[in-house]
Amino acid sequence: MSKCVNGLRSRLTAIIGAQWGDEGKGKLVDILAEKYDYCARFNGGANAGHTIVVGGVKYAFHLLPCGILYQTCMNVIGNGVVVNIPTLFEELAQLDKNRVDYTGRLVISNRAHLVVDGLLEADAKSESDSRKKFLGTTKRGIGPTYSAKALRQGLRVGDLLHWDTFLLKYHSLNAKLREQEGIQIDTQKEINTLKDYRDILINRNMIVDTISLIANARKDGRRILAEGANATMLDIDYGTYPYVTSSSTNVGGVCTGLGVPPSAIETVIGIVKAYTTRVGEGPFPTELTNETGKYLQKTGHEFGATTGRPRRCGWLDIPILRYSIQINGHSSINLTKLDILTGLEEIKIGVNYLLNGKVIDYIPAQLEELAQVEVEYITVKGWKQDISDCKTFSELPVEAQNYIKKIEELLGIPVSWIGNGPQREKIILKD
């Protein structure tokens, strides 16, 4: 690990969500990407939603790396990502509309797997099946695509380079979906669509071996920013299973999703919202179902960038942040949306979980136990002053400073960045 905790000087920095997603990862990625040579997505698919506001224009990226907005940054969709090609081109159309030139600055791993219509249908069918537990997926085909990958039945982006072979694999996958799931789709329509997009991808040389590309970039001393999607508590292994996503959302996913060794990762910044939110089902120990929760939801505009679903809101949860630090080895924290807490008389912080009346130092793996935990809180004073124009830590109200210092004390790592508004420039670099 590098001594650089804020990512400004590191050669490879990973941006990891430390809660249940929607922490505001895209904003810091956007800020840092300007200083990096490469910006690389390593996991997930169009179930992610990174919203960025630049020059008054709002961009909602689901597949594109946020570095696409910078002319000096090469953007990589890594092998750990599952790619819906039509969705990708919808995002590229957004760039075309706003005259963002990305020529020669976007490549896709030939090992990344494809989300196709049959897998989208499988996702929708699974979620609507009343016999199964409702998991609250985004219905973007993510789970079925990773399932097909694990079953060695999936389609890869590189398969598009060999069209006749691709068609054989495509029809084989759809035959299995018909037989096993009863799924019928218009295969010829999708084939025609994919053929058109394939020609564009090939003409633009966008399908490449990204593992070799990144290895050579590292050898040449280029700086790489690894952009995570989702978050630690949604990780397929470490999250609140089964209310999780289907990929490795932690720092290990950087290695498996980009093909880089653990020793290459110098800085790991954990993105932490100043309170806690989660979308969909699953346990949420610090959840607020009262007026304060509604206030946070309304003031924070807590609605999913991908689905538009309202987010459940609660107090900051220190136990899950300690857990994220254990797994990811965060160098520092980017505390986002601090401005949303403005106006609250008091702010609570969940500092410990109690199970059967005893403090525990772990996150229960069984949901039955996690649902039973009680939360021990401490209370700190809130602040009334508008903090959106603060540019340094010392300009923040003393109560806001104390809130941040308490978080640092409880976690044992520094807060290096502080978000105090939705705009790109509304962020404080804390010394």
Swiss-Prot record:
Keywords: Cytoplasm, GTP-binding, Ligase, Magnesium, Metal-binding, Nucleotide-binding, Purine biosynthesis. InterPro entries: Adenylosuccin_syn_GTP-bd (IPR018220), Adenylosuccin_syn_Lys_AS (IPR033128), Adenylosuccinate_synth_dom1 (IPR042109), Adenylosuccinate_synth_dom2 (IPR042110), Adenylosuccinate_synth_dom3 (IPR042111), Adenylosuccinate_synthetase (IPR001114), P-loop_NTPase (IPR027417). Its cofactor is Mg(2+). GTP binds at residues 21-27, 49-51, 311, 337-339, 419-421. It is found in: Cytoplasm. It is an enzyme of class 6 (ligase). Its EC number is 6.3.4.4. It catalyses: IMP + L-aspartate + GTP = N(6)-(1,2-dicarboxyethyl)-AMP + GDP + phosphate + 2 H(+). Binds 1 Mg(2+) ion per subunit. SUPFAM superfamilies: P-loop containing nucleoside triphosphate hydrolases. One of its GO terms (cellular component) is cytoplasm. IMP binds at D22, E23, G24, K25, N47, A48, G49, H50, T138, R152, N230, T245, R309. Gene3D superfamilies: Adenylosuccinate Synthetase, subunit A, domain 1, Adenylosuccinate Synthetase, subunit A, domain 2, Adenylosuccinate Synthetase, subunit A, domain 3. The active site is at D22, H50. It comes from the Eukaryota. Its main location: cytoplasm. Mg(2+) binds at D22, G49. One of its GO terms (biological process) is IMP metabolic process. GO terms for molecular function: adenylosuccinate synthase activity; GTP binding; magnesium ion binding. Plays an important role in the de novo pathway and in the salvage pathway of purine nucleotide biosynthesis. Catalyzes the first committed step in the biosynthesis of AMP from IMP. Homodimer. Belongs to the adenylosuccinate synthetase family. NCBIfam families: PRK01117.1 (NF002223), purA (TIGR00184). HAMAP family: Adenylosucc_synth. This is Adenylosuccinate synthetase. It comes from Paramecium tetraurelia.
